[in-house]
Amino acid sequence: MVELLGIIRIRGWAKAPWYINETLEMLRLRYNFNTMMYPKTSQILGMLNKVSPYVTWGEIDPDTLKLLIIKRLETAKGDKVSDSYVKEVLKIENIDTMVKQLYEGKIYLHKLDQYFKLPIRLHPPKGGFKGSVKRPYKNKGEFGYRGDKINELMRRMM
């Protein structure tokens, strides 16, 4: 079973060094409140450590991932994702099995560009951020690694 990381960009590009912007481009996080899902690998973790003042990340659970797919993921044409679309395009029964296959590592969301609009766009969090986006999460801020608390933030941003 693959651990999926949910990564959200929380700061803009102004005054960011070129290597930060370049790494965020590689992660496909071009704008504020964009999110992507990647498997937890040493390469991804290295990139996240490099850009940690601009993103927050953590392990996403299957329920939040399913909700994210249903509410915010769009098809290549801009429509909402449905069971019929997933069955037609990916040859997968429904969204539940798609989530299961994402966690088993059989399919990767970041490699499905031709079927979905990626990255996934989110709203700003309802109620605002609880801390400053200029401080790390462990010091009552918002950026950096936050573990399974990413699910709570994503639900507030859908």
Curated annotation (Swiss-Prot):
The question of whether Ion transport is a record keyword is answered with no
One family from Pfam that matches here is Ribosomal_L30
Q: Please name every pair of cysteines joined by a disulfide bond in this record.
A: none
Gene Ontology molecular function: RNA binding; structural constituent of ribosome
> What GO cellular component is one of the record's annotations?
cytosolic large ribosomal subunit
Alphabetic keyword roster: Ribonucleoprotein, Ribosomal protein
Q: Could you state one GO biological process linked to this protein?
A: translation
Assembly and partners? Part of the 50S ribosomal subunit.
Q: What family, per the record?
A: Belongs to the universal ribosomal protein uL30 family.
PANTHER family xref list: 60S RIBOSOMAL PROTEIN L7, LARGE RIBOSOMAL SUBUNIT PROTEIN UL30
NCBIfam families per the UniProt record, alphabetical: PRK06049.1, uL30_arch
User: What is the name of the protein in this document?
Assistant: Large ribosomal subunit protein uL30
- Gene that encodes the chain: rpl30
